[in-house]
């Protein structure tokens, strides 16, 4: 079967999103069944205050974003003393002393003056039963992120961009936060120029999450590795989490892509990891990772060592047949171009998927080309 047929549904969903007043398609993998705002009549916020109100109220909502909502300057700026753990060169991020982080963890780092935009620090609260959908390439939230927390569930974030959240400053803000939640689908989202994490799942149970066909764009003038490659990618740290990463484009990063620990079962399938000056996977205690059908192109270190968690890297055709007992198929090989290796043959992870909704996987042959054309907002 040709890839243009295998991925036709995903590609068609993005093409039609320009005019569709609502969610297109359905979540694959662990967040399968999420409905967001369902059949609620679409609303079109026109101001930042209206957007915050719609996202935070208790009504099921289909919220259509047809413009840029720029939060920069809406809460003023703060000038204070921070620190420079990675040096003071022009490409290095410096850190805000949020919750005394510099004092407690970087006491020997040089002190520096920091001036940051206060709106970026605390993301917008998204309550249960919300669909946030961008119209074409128009739906942008700038200078502030989103957070699905404190028991919120059944949330869809589709076809938007979240950008420009204090990119010079660690602790300047995250793009999307999920914590103490369930059934969250992040789809065809672009994140760019973020101070801290592009996506973070916090330490409470975040349960069922799918991140699909999204672009994590790590290009930045500032990074913790001082090389123009953003370090803080995707951090999965929940206490009872099942996460599907499918069809995403992870570009120009240097670390935490993803960092997996806590008690997190991760299915990483058919993603493109491209142009990393650093490491991709970081697997800590309580991280259970099954990776198949992914492409690693120009990635220095595919998996940081030592691995404290568990990894099944779909290492060879014979071993991959063991997936059939739970998946109903063999797992797909990963592909590597000018990249490091990925070694992990812990087949015990396969049984953890029993009874779960498992995303389909395709061979990696055309994944890179397809993903570059189709992942992210408006594609």
Swiss-Prot record:
Pfam families: Pectate_lyase_4. Residues 1-20 form the signal peptide. One of its GO terms (cellular component) is extracellular region. Glycans are attached at residues 129, 252. It is an enzyme of class 4 (lyase). SUPFAM superfamilies: Pectin lyase-like. GO terms for biological process: cell wall organization; pectin catabolic process. InterPro entries: Pec_lyase, Pectin_lyas_fold, Pectin_lyase_fold/virulence, PEL. Belongs to the polysaccharide lyase 1 family. This is Probable pectin lyase B. The lineage of its organism: Eukaryota, Fungi, Dikarya, Ascomycota, Pezizomycotina.
